From Swiss-Prot:
Organism: Methanosarcina acetivorans (strain ATCC 35395 / DSM 2834 / JCM 12185 / C2A)
InterPro entries: Ntn_hydrolases_N (IPR029055), Proteasome_alpha (IPR050115), Proteasome_alpha-type (IPR023332), Proteasome_asu_arc (IPR019982), Proteasome_asu_N (IPR000426), Proteasome_sua/b (IPR001353)
Primary localisation category: cytoplasm
Name of encoding gene: psmA
Functional summary from the UniProt entry: Component of the proteasome core, a large protease complex with broad specificity involved in protein degradation.
Domain of life where this protein originates: Archaea
Keywords attached to this entry: Cytoplasm, Proteasome
Family listed: Belongs to the peptidase T1A family.
Protein name from the UniProt record: Proteasome subunit alpha
């Protein structure tokens, strides 16, 4: 009998070596998801997602992986999209309740902790399953860019730059080599796209990329339009075209 037999059927039962297999399986769903990237810059924070469209018959606009939570907060997701939408809807309600109750926008760390608390409860009660999605939550607090990662267990970490999804390892390798805290948002977007290019082995274009930004200047979340994304993509393609031709 396999060592985990029986222990992977109940979310509330630890295996003898201290593991919750259902939580680990939920993390595997994230690892198989599309690659999402978050980067803090000197003047804001950026989110990028490679939507990985698998069929030319799919309308690219119908696939959404970056969501607005509040005026100053956005989130990128990897894993089960339906689970992510449920969490995003909950986060939006929490943000609205905070505005009504306190007449001020909710903090990025506060909303991240609330989502993590909710995800954590789904790891300790019977009759439910963990959320099979991870979120990168980005925004601006007190004139500082903030970037948090939430995983299916409810764990919360703040990063300068990170990634979730299938290409995480390749992206993080690029970040560890090239990330600088003093880079601006333009440079951060190009770094993120460069990392996604390498993670996807060059198989990406403007139609598969989604980009969201929050700047310190106006503290507003917005998604980049197709022409803006195309401009950055062309810079990356030109860079790698030059690199490949010189080799």
């Amino acid at each position: 009998m396999a060592p985990q037999m029986g222990y992977d059927r109940a979310i509330t039962v630890f295996s003898p070596d201290g593991r919750l297999f259902q939580v680990e399986y939920a993390r595997e769903a994230v690892k198989r998801g599309t690659t999402a990237v978050g980067i803090k810059a000197a003047d804001g924070v950026v989110l990028l997602v490679d939507k990985r469209i698998t069929s030319r018959l799919v309308e690219a606009e119908s696939i959404e992986k970056i969501f607005q939570i509040d005026e100053h907060i956005g989130a990128a997701t990897s894993g089960l999209v339906a689970d992510a939408r449920s969490l995003v809807d909950r986060a939006r309600v929490e943000a609205q309740v905070n505005r009504v109750s306190y007449d001020e926008p909710i903090g990025v760390e506060v909303i991240s902790k609330k989502i993590c608390d909710h995800k954590q409860t789904y790891t300790q009660y019977g009759g439910v399953r963990p959320y099979g999605t991870a979120l990168l939550i980005a925004g601006v607090d007190d004139n500082k860019p903030r970037l948090f990662e939430t995983d299916p267990s409810g764990a919360l970490l703040e990063y300068k730059a990170t990634a979730i999804g299938a290409g995480r390892n390749a992206v993080v390798e690029v970040f560890e080599a090239d990330y600088r805290e003093d880079m601006n948002m333009d440079a951060a977007i190009l770094l993120g796209m460069d990392a996604l290019y390498k993670a996807a082995e060059g198989k990406f274009d403007a139609g598969t990329l989604e980009v969201g930004v929050v700047s310190l200047e106006d503290k507003k979340f917005r998604k980049l339009g197709p022409e803006e994304v195309e401009n950055y993509v062309q810079q990356i393609l030109e860079k790698h075209k030059g690199t490949e031709s010189s080799e």
